[in-house]
């Protein structure tokens, strides 16, 4: 990710789980638990797909999102950190 274009963490996270099709558990503010894969999102809602069915979930109703697998964010920054560590040990 270039440093001149800032993205918010929410968009980076949702885009990462969308691209990798990582299964998620989403807890709503009323306690309902939803599970599925993010297929699309915008500023106000997330489209969650499970068993061939889609659910449109409004972001203001979401309390917590738990991915089923680790999510890698800011991969370019991680590569820069690794390179800096290698040169420091040389």
Curated annotation (Swiss-Prot):
Q: Domain Sm, which positions?
A: 11-71
Please tell me whether the keyword RNA-binding is annotated for this protein.
yes
Give an example GO molecular function.
Answer: RNA binding
| InterPro entries hit by this protein | Hfq, LSM_dom_sf, Sm
Asked if the keyword RNA-binding belongs to this entry, the reply reads yes
Q: Name one Pfam family in it.
A: Hfq
Output the GO biological process annotations, alphabetical, semicolon-separated. regulation of DNA-templated transcription; regulation of RNA stability; regulation of translation, ncRNA-mediated
- Superkingdom is Bacteria
What keywords would UniProt list here? RNA-binding, Stress response
- GO cellular component terms, semicolon-separated: cytosol
What is the similarity comment for this entry?
Belongs to the Hfq family.
Matching entries from NCBIfam families are given as: Hfq (TIGR02383), PRK00395.1 (NF001602)
Q: Cite the record's note on assembly.
A: Homohexamer.
The record's function comment reads: RNA chaperone that binds small regulatory RNA (sRNAs) and mRNAs to facilitate mRNA translational regulation in response to envelope stress, environmental stress and changes in metabolite concentrations. Also binds with high specificity to tRNAs.
> What is this protein identified as?
RNA-binding protein Hfq
Which organism is this protein's natural source? Maricaulis maris (strain MCS10)
Q: List the taxonomic lineage.
A: Bacteria, Pseudomonadati, Pseudomonadota, Alphaproteobacteria, Maricaulales
Q: Which gene encodes it?
A: hfq
């Amino acid at each position: 990710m270039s440093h001149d274009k800032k993205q918010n963490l929410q968009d980076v996270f949702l885009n990462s789980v969308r691209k990798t099709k990582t299964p998620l558990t989403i807890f709503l503010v009323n306690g309902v638990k939803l599970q599925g894969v993010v297929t699309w999102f915008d500023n106000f809602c997330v489209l969650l797909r499970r068993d061939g069915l889609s659910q449109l979930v409004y972001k203001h109703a979401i309390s917590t999102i738990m991915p089923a697998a680790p999510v890698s964010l800011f991969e370019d920054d991680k590569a820069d950190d690794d390179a800096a560590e290698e040169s420091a040990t040389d």
